[in-house]
Design a protein with these regions (language model features):
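Flexible mid-to-C-terminal extensions adjoining Fe-S/redox cofactors in radical SAM and related proteins
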Residues: 1-40, 353-443
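Conserved alpha-helical substructure of the radical SAM core
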Residues: 12-20, 24, 35-164, 168, ...
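Short alpha-helical segments and helix-capping/turn motifs at coil-helix boundaries
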Residues: 56-57, 70, 163-164, 232-235, ...
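Extracellular structured ligand-interaction cores
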Residues: 70, 324, 438
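A short acidic, helix-capping loop that chelates divalent metal ions and anchors anionic groups
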Residues: 94, 185-191, 259-262
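Radical SAM/AdoMet-radical enzyme domain recognition
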Residues: 105-123, 132-253
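Radical SAM enzyme [4Fe-4S]-AdoMet core and its adjacent flexible, acidic
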Residues: 195-199, 211-408, 412
Length: 443
């Protein structure tokens, strides 16, 4: 329901009473995102085949509405830190979970055998995945199995302290370092990580820059209201200043996995729309609230590709309220152009989706390709593009943004492409079953 321009979730439990929580702090952006709600094709060979009610038989199950776009595979629950804020509750379970190399391979094979779309991307997590004894071997095997995008979610200690380990990981096929990054002050890390960590983060960036063919870095800030929301713009500037190796930022508003009273919940709760509003304010309008779109906004591109090529393609049919993102073209920290400034996103995606439905019913695919190109010419304004880009080179960048070719394409242009987004993990206070059914990031 809406209250004072905010979207509030209210629940009533016979045993535990009334619960109220802000899920989005801006109803306008919430309603805009709802326009991009799509049900996906699910999984043809789920682990649970006869589930009756979601989420009682979670698995993946036959009721799930999205295939796996990104898999998170925990290599261990051990960690080389003891953070007060820890999504995985690492080192606190009282036992060690650490699958053998063969077990990890079997899990990866299950993901690659998923139908009708094989899982294209994998992120190794934990605990701290880089302390797994056969980490480099796992990266090599993931590459061998055909994962197009291989990531690791890390605190950065191993990559900061052992350059040869970083080099071996990169040479094995590591594409992206998802680097925990809560701010540019050790005062923040003392609260969030119980130790100074800023020097470690700087060292990771420095070491990655030394590599001949470096993986991309994505900064992953956990945002807690009252702790570090004032760091959003400084972190954004840091990413721009280091855009030769930092290719993205993925903010994660804090999820409350333990007990918390109502006052503390309201005090510390931070939503995706808070992020969009704060970034606009802190950058003085350089990145506006209107530049953000939900993850499934790109579904029409996938459905059109599926219709034209005749085979299912990766489709991000997450719930429209799970994540927000925008793409930026960056020349330097002072020259940034959001993609939305030269692409009319909403009408373009609407017409592409309508075209995909027509293409599904047509045996002749060439007219659909020609129509798609005419739509792109209609809604992409070359006069507003970054200098050095035209429609064709821009389309090549988009088509290769998930692969190594994107770096080669961008190297010919003075502008770099950067992803800025946010994904809000659910907790008991904002749990939404409709989000769960459509989740495309599977553990």
């Amino acid at each position: 329901m809406e209250k004072d321009g905010k979207v509030v979730m209210e629940k009533e439990c016979p045993e535990h009473g009334h619960f109220s929580d802000i899920v989005w702090s801006d109803v306008e952006l919430y309603l805009k995102s709802e326009q991009f709600a799509f049900d996906g094709i699910g999984v043809e060979n789920p682990f649970i085949t006869n589930a009756k009610v979601c989420p009682n038989d979670c698995g993946l199950c036959n009721l799930h509405l999205s295939h796996t776009s990104l898999a998170n595979l925990d290599l261990t629950n051990r960690c080389n830190m003891k953070c007060p804020i820890c999504f995985a509750n690492a080192n606190a379970s009282g036992y060690v979970y650490e699958p053998s190399f063969d077990e990890v391979v079997k899990m990866m094979q299950v993901l690659r055998n998923s139908k009708p779309v094989a899982c294209p991307a994998i992120q190794f997590a934990g605990g701290e995945p880089t302390i797994y004894p056969q980490f480099v071997d796992v990266i090599k095997k993931a590459k061998e199995l055909g994962f197009a995008q291989i990531q690791v979610a890390t605190n950065g200690l191993m990559f900061a302290n052992d350059f040869e380990f970083l080099k071996a990981s990169a040479e094995a096929g590591l594409n992206t370092i998802y680097l925990q990054f809560d701010g540019l002050s050790d005062d923040i890390y003392m609260v969030s990580r119980a130790r100074k960590m800023l020097e470690v983060k700087m060292k990771v960036v420095e070491n990655v820059r030394k590599l001949n063919n470096p993986p991309s870095i994505v900064l992953v800030p956990v945002i807690v209201k009252g702790l570090n929301e004032d760091q959003i713009e400084p972190m954004f500037r840091f990413a721009l200043e280091n855009s030769d190796v930092i290719r993205g930022m993925n903010f994660q508003p804090v999820a409350f996995t333990g007990r918390i009273n109502k006052d503390e919940l309201a005090k510390q709760r931070y939503t995706l729309t808070d992020l969009a509003i704060d970034l606009e304010a802190q950058t003085k309008g350089q990145i506006k609230k209107e530049d953000w779109f939900p993850v499934p906004s790109v579904v029409p591109i996938s459905t059109l590709a599926t219709a034209i090529l005749g085979e299912p393609k990766v489709t991000f049919t997450t719930h429209p309220h799970c994540g927000l993102a925008t793409y930026l073209f960056v020349q330097d920290k002072d020259h940034v152009i959001p993609l939305t400034h030269f692409v009319d996103v909403e009408p373009l995606f609407k017409e592409l989706f309508e075209l995909s439905k027509k293409a599904e019913c047509s045996k002749l695919k060439l007219p659909s390709k020609m129509k798609a190109y005419s739509l792109l010419k209609k809604y992409i304004h070359e006069d507003k593009m970054p200098e050095g880009l035209d429609t064709m080179s821009f389309l090549k960048l988009l088509s290769s943004v998930m692969g190594d070719e994107s770096k080669q394409s961008l190297s010919k242009c003075s502008w770099k492409m950067m992803f800025v987004g946010g994904m809000h993990f659910q907790d008991l206070y904002n749990y939404d079953i409709e989000r769960v059914k459509r989740c495309a990031i599977h553990y």
